[in-house]
Amino acid sequence: MSFIRLHKDAAAMWLSRLLPAAIFILVGLFSIMVIRDYGRESAAARQTLLEKGNVLIRALESGTRVGMGMRMHHAQQQTLLEEMAGQPGVLWFAVTDAQGVIITHSNPGMVGKSLYSPSEMHQLNPGPQECWRRVDVAANGETVPALEIYRQFQPLFGMRGHGMRGHGMARSANDDEPAKQTIFIAFDASELAATQAREWRNTLIVLSALAAVLLATLLAFFWYQRYQRSHRELLDAMKRKEKLVAMGHLAAGVAHEIRNPLSSIKGLAKYFAERTPAGGESHELAQVMAKEADRLNRVVSELLELVKPAHLTLQAVNLNDIITHSLNLVSQDAQSREIQLRFTANETLKRIQADPDRLTQVLLNLYLNAIHAIGRQGTITVEAKESGTDRVIITVTDSGKGIAPDQLEAIFTPYFTTKADGTGLGLAVVQNIIEQHGGAIKVKSIEGKGAVFTIWLPVIARQQD
């Protein structure tokens, strides 16, 4: 059963990582496709207008060429242009000279007027190939978007050598060359503009939907990770409590069965120590027996301290005062080992709800462990600061020998110790007290470079069950 549960947990973990990655990839690919396809419909509509304009321009050139062969004049060319301007979507036709003066126009009243200034004609620089641009023109009393197509007007192209000299065509200063003319045709681009607006709107909607999917995936992923973390922490807490319950039954039996004999052993050891000469072997053995009885009694007391619920006396406390007081308690021991204690009070630190005696017990345990890890000549640094609006952080950093990576995970486990004379219950008690305050404690260390213990405490503590 445990194997099946482990297999399901592993599958859920991999799915929680692969599914967001797959969604990110699909959203990215779909976004690329949407962006790449943006403008295709409007480009196709614009190309249709360009091809239609090219056909009409060539038709006008052909008609003009035929009319010239039949000795037709500007009047016939004007009539032909007016008839072609009646095509659907055509706003106007115009043929101008190099200075922008209208020679023929679909609106006869425009003939002889200036369509564009010479400087504008120079900027347009019409050539033999069709060019286009977007303009706004007045039509039926309102301004409409238009697609203007223009190029050199070439009705004589291919006629030389056939005896045609360009009848009815304006001549340049050099009588051998006709004056350069430009043909303009303007199409109603309202549908093209609507198509572009629709494309932009649809693309924006699709990209917004993709962004929403991406954001929802990110939120779901982070919420799932948060749920998994909370779930793991809850399972760890349940395991610890189950272990503490089992240890509580054991501790109760141990305390009952061991303490009474220990008291007798200690009493007898003191009795023999008093009855033997000081400095003798028997006297020293009796003292060793008494000390070992005290140590075993202390182990039983710490075990009971660990397994029984901590009854906190919560009150508003100033962390600066707690830290300063606890450092003073170990200052003599640190000074004898040439260990510097560093702490700068944080005057902006808010008061928190905590049990001052229990908190002092926690800090003393961390200081003593740090002093033991340093040995001689080192530094212990304590810092306190706020974390957001509802938590404070206390860090205890030492310059000791550090903790091996394989020991970090077990450092808060009861009876795990790296000291020859340690019981392995100190940090377990520390963790229990911090968790009773509704906080947490973590440790980071690089072997040979010291350790950092970090405590998170809520500003308003509620004793945990």
Curated annotation (Swiss-Prot):
Organism expressing this protein natively: Salmonella typhi
TM regions (residue ranges): 15-35, 204-224
Alphabetized NCBIfam families for the sequence: PRK10364.1
Any one annotated GO CC term: plasma membrane
Subcellular location: Cell inner membrane
PROSITE patterns: HIS_KIN (PS50109)
Keywords, ordered alphabetically: ATP-binding, Cell inner membrane, Cell membrane, Kinase, Membrane, Nucleotide-binding, Phosphoprotein, Stress response, Transferase, Transmembrane, Transmembrane helix, Two-component regulatory system, Zinc
Name of the protein in question: Sensor histidine kinase ZraS
Histidine kinase domain ranges (all copies): 253-461
Assigned EC number: 2.7.13.3
Record's bilayer topology term: Multi-pass membrane protein
Signal peptide start and end residues: none
Periplasmic topological domain: 36-203
GO molecular function, one term: phosphorelay sensor kinase activity
Gene3D superfamilies for the chain: 1.10.287.130, Histidine kinase-like ATPase, C-terminal domain, PAS domain
